[in-house]
């Protein structure tokens, strides 16, 4: 950092989409850990933090009258972002002790107004990591119903049991997923 500042690289705002080296590093990370290939120049955007990215995604994708499916408990910013977009939150409960959800409850939360699914795995605040089977189910429904998924994966490397699997890695999901 000191060298960058001394060489005049840290004296102004960065490019709006993020510095190229960081976008390339993010692309390399996704390829190395998950086999997902992203173009750093057209498919990666660096924000000031995950909360900003979540707000931008929900505000860009939702309009008044849309519905967003979330899993509760949830990170409190989700509700605020959905409300700011004029959308309605539809809740699917994660039940202890394993914080599993009922597929029937998930399906009941969907309607013709559903625009997107907001998924957080590893989950805050429970630490739950959605299983391959759960993600396959969500992905299948998203593809069948042409839904978008915004996935909050900020804790992807804080996994104590199981493994983190990005929903974007399932068939038909890469092009309908915004990963944070």
Tell me what each language-model feature is.
Residues 1-49, 56, 105:
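N-terminal small-domain helix-loop-helix segment of the aminotransferase-like
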Residues 50-51, 75, 121-124:
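Short glycine-rich anion-binding loops that position phosphate/pyrophosphate groups of nucleotides
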Residues 60-82:
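Conserved PLP-anchoring active-site segment centered on the Schiff-base-forming lysine
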């Amino acid at each position: 950092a000191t060298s960058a500042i001394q060489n005049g690289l840290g004296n102004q705002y960065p490019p709006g989409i993020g510095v190229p080296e960081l976008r390339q590093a993010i692309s390399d990370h996704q390829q190395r850990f998950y086999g997902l290939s992203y173009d750093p120049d057209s498919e990666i955007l660096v924000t000031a933090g995950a909360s900003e990215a979540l707000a931008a995604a929900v505000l860009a994708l939702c309009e008044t009258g849309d519905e967003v499916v979330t899993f509760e408990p949830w990170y409190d910013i989700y509700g605020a972002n959905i409300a700011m977009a004029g959308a309605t939150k539809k809740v699917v409960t994660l039940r202890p002790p394993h914080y599993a959800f009922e597929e029937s409850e998930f399906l009941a939360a969907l309607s013709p107004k559903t625009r997107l699914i907001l998924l957080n795995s590893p989950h805050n605040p429970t630490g739950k990591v959605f299983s391959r089977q759960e993600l396959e189910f969500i992905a299948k429904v998203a593809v069948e119903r042409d839904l978008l998924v915004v996935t909050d994966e900020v804790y992807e490397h804080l996994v104590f049991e199981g493994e983190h699997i990005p929903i974007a890695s399932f068939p038909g999901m890469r092009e309908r997923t915004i990963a944070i």
